């Protein structure tokens, strides 16, 4: 009976607090600021904010997430850095051939470190979003206790080799998620994985407080009125040359029409050259990368998305949240599920 006095009773609430959280790692190396890293950060933040069951970490292999470090730290998301943390400064990223070369370097250098990290840290889940071939090879060659989840956005080009790799590797994946219904149906049509493994999972995009705060900040370096706005990487996907050609026709009818293009990328010289050649410098203005786009987005008379494909199109959702009228191309995925003609765009 005396021994009973020494027993310490623990409340159920304390037991819940002591519950071991499931570890989720994100693998999404990128070369240029695109929508995916924002999706990664928002996903990790949302899981930790709205659930006590998960502990999220982002793998920052070659310093790609350094530009988001402040945001990641503020959201209490862990970062796993590698010894190649400053490699991003030296990797070429403009141009298809140069970027492919950089991805090959990343694949080779990260093969063993990623295997070691997964073996030592033993995360419950690894969410794979970019350079997906590396985790696929790892899961084929080695055995992990980690459940691999593949995130597929857009309509990926499926060569014979890629289709073969996916068909073999995805048998060992736990889940495949897509941000839109269209993409999910496309992946199902490839017959590379059981339909039961493929799910639609919408990206957490809108941070209401942040957008309202950013919108109220003034950008002293940019001052424009009565303008249309387009935002995105200056690449083939965003189709800005087509947009410039279309806007040229608008200018012939409305000489004071103005289009601002915010973004940077491999097609910048081509776009600038077209603008100069057609004497549109007063009508079409390239701004470069704008860190806080919301004041411009909020002030635009019209937001234009000219992309060849999107999934789902983050900027389109953000523009809609800012109550800015939208005009979008009819992409295979994304906009067609977001915009109803003559209702919200």
Regions found by a protein language model. Name each.
Residues 173-198, 205-207:
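A short, active-site helix/loop in glycosyltransferases that binds the activated sugar's phosphate group
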Residues 37-42, 226-249, 259, 266-272, ...:
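A conserved mid-protein helix/loop that constitutes part of the nucleotide-sugar donor-binding site
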Residues 160-161, 185-189, 202-224, 295:
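Acidic anion/phosphate-binding donor-loop and adjacent secondary structure
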Residues 12, 27-34, 46, 50-101:
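N-terminal strand-loop element at the rim of the active site
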Residues 107-110, 128-134, 152:
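Short His-centered aromatic/hydrophobic patch
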Residues 325-329:
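Short hydrophobic beta-strand element within catalytic cores of glycosyltransferases
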Residues 289, 308:
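Aromatic "clamp/platform" in nucleotide-sugar-dependent glycosyltransferases that forms part
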Residues 155-156, 183, 201-212, 233, ...:
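Short beta-strand->alpha-helix junction loop in the catalytic core
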